Curated annotation (Swiss-Prot):
Subunit structure: Interacts directly with activated KRAS in a GTP-dependent manner. Interacts (via SARAH domain) with STK3/MST2 and STK4/MST1.
Protein name: Ras association domain-containing protein 2
Top-level taxonomic group: Eukaryota
Record-linked SUPFAM superfamilies: Ubiquitin-like (SSF54236)
CDD domains listed in its UniProt record: RA_RASSF2
Native source species: Rattus norvegicus (Rat)
């Protein structure tokens, strides 16, 4: 990547801009941190617009359950061949159409030791009596593996597999069927979405919900930058999450981007975050010290104005005692 010096301004929020050269320095640091990983970001120029694109890690921070779609209308899930059908290749006709799976005939299979001569004498011949005709249907030959699979009694039928696949969804590699379509993702578990620097917060939220087929409205959620100190900064609708991540730095041990409920989380400023992790007795001692400091400042202020008041009165008395001169 060419990180050349640039003086153009890049939008990073509503009425907020930063020099392109500064963003490129942050981007260089970001990519050095993730060197050799798929979290590295790329940038390009498109119609005089500077665009950064790549994966953004987002942690789940939900407290209430979310609802999954029962079925994706835009994607057809094709079930795998059932164990009762023959091996792949024998289900397709000449035109590539799927034929009905062949069922295994329920016959008694026994091994008969026939002499070689008898086998040659009883070999099937064609109508002209020329030479033995070999069957050219390898897809109908039963093998011992086919018989073994047939004898397993706990194998699901094709309809059962189709029904299970239809109601399965995955978030972070975990599958949920229709009975658990309402659930709460594990707090702190991480997912990612591929976005670019021109996408605003609402656009990223909709992309994330669509990725996992979540029925909840994007208006219910918000993105927060959460620091290890406890500081929580809510990303505004006009903010660009990928730019915000770059400016925060690449290390997720310092700050992470969380998906949270909009009405369940309050922002925590840096000044307040300094005291969040202290125990109650320590916080009370802080309050007592602050109260003592406030009392001292009030006392100093009162003494200052008391002195000023005395000086003014003394001067007024001096003026009153001085005889008037013509």
């Amino acid at each position: 990547m060419d990180y050349t010096h640039q003086t153009a301004l890049i939008p990073c929020g509503q009425d907020k801009y930063m020099p392109k050269s500064e963003l490129l320095l942050h981007l260089k640091t970001y990519n050095l941190y993730y060197e050799g990983q798929n979290l590295q970001l790329r940038h390009r120029e498109e119609e005089d617009e500077f665009i950064v694109e790549g994966l953004l890690n987002i942690s789940w921070g939900l407290r209430r359950p979310i609802r999954l779609q029962m079925q994706d209308d835009h994607e057809r899930i094709r079930p795998p061949p059932s164990s009762s059908s023959w091996h792949s290749g024998c289900n397709l006709g000449a035109q590539g159409t799927t034929l009905k799976p062949l069922t295994v005939p329920t016959v008694q299979i026994s091994e008969v030791d026939m002499p070689v001569e008898n086998m040659e004498m009883h070999s099937p011949t064609d109508s002209r009596g020329l030479k033995p005709v070999q069957e050219d249907t390898p897809q109908l030959m039963r093998t011992r593996s086919d018989v073994g699979v047939r004898r397993r009694g706990n194998v699901r039928t094709s309809s059962d597999q189709r029904r299970i696949r239809r109601h399965r969804f995955s978030i972070n590699g975990h599958f949920y069927n229709h009975k658990t379509s309402v659930f709460t993702p594990a707090y702190g578990s991480v997912t990612n979405v591929r976005i670019n620097s021109t996408m605003t917060t609402p656009q990223v939220l909709k992309l994330l919900l669509n990725k996992f087929k979540i029925e909840n409205s994007a208006e219910e959620f918000a993105l927060y930058v959460v620091h290890t100190s406890g500081e929580k900064q809510k990303l505004k609708n006009s903010d660009y999450p990928l730019i915000a991540r770059i400016l925060q730095g690449p290390c997720e041990q310092i700050s992470k981007v969380f998906l949270m409920e909009k009405d369940q989380v309050e922002e925590v400023t840096y000044d307040v975050a300094q005291y969040i992790k202290f125990e109650m007795p320590v916080l009370k001692s802080f309050i007592q010290k602050l109260q003592e400091e406030e009392d001292r400042e009030v006392e100093k202020l009162m003494q200052k104005y008391t002195v000023l008041r005395l000086m003014i009165r003394q001067r007024l008395e001096e003026i009153a005692e001085t005889p008037e001169t013509i």
